[in-house]
């Protein structure tokens, strides 16, 4: 039987090679964090992969939806990064198949300037508040979330905070280890079993 979840909430690689460290130093005012190099975002997922993922869920929220071929949507989620004038994007878009109007979330995330300082462990990590906002837009009857591009587990943490079960998949072992550490800091109650095994 095929695994199914109520909601797909993910931030797939866009194929922009951010993992190569090409944007390590955009300014001389601060030293950018070195995340190492990898090839996980050299290519975006195929159209087939996205269709298959969408088939596994009733509701979908896909960050970077503007980079992919997806059906028309009346509900885009817009994350306004409150950046000011610089060479980073002013906002990020999430495509959805939700039945509501476009929604905007204002949350500063600009290098050292962050609305709520959060340790960044992944080059394309979304703030927890942004994932919580996105998940709050899903229908209230959502009880399970799938994130097949989990990174360091931000979607899983947002689901936990909302009392929603979640499944995360990540191909990079180091990010899985980081996600385990983050999740151990937010321990789930498994009926007396509180250890998360890596």
Residue ranges of model-derived segments:
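Class I S-adenosyl-L-methionine-dependent methyltransferase catalytic core
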Residues: 1-146, 152-198
């Amino acid at each position: 039987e095929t695994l199914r979840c109520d909601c797909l909430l993910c931030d797939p690689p866009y194929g922009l090679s951010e993992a190569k460290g090409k944007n390590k130093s955009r300014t001389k005012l601060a030293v950018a964090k070195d995340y190492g190099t990898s090839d996980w975002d050299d290519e975006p997922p195929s159209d087939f992969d996205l269709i298959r993922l969408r088939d596994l869920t009733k509701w979908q929220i896909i960050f970077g939806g503007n980079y992919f071929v997806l059906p028309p949507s009346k509900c885009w989620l817009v994350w306004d990064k409150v950046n000011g004038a610089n060479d980073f994007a002013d906002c990020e878009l999430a495509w959805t198949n939700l039945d509501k109007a476009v929604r905007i979330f204002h949350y500063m995330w600009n290098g050292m300037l962050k609305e709520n300082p959060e340790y960044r462990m992944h080059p394309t990590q979304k703030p927890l508040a942004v994932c919580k906002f996105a998940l709050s837009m899903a229908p209230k009857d959502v009880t399970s979330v799938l994130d097949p591009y989990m990174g360091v587990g931000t979607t899983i943490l947002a689901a936990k905070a909302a009392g929603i079960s979640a499944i995360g998949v990540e191909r990079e072992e180091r990010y899985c280890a980081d996600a385990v550490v983050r999740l151990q800091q937010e321990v789930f109650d498994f009926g007396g079993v509180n250890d998360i095994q890596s």
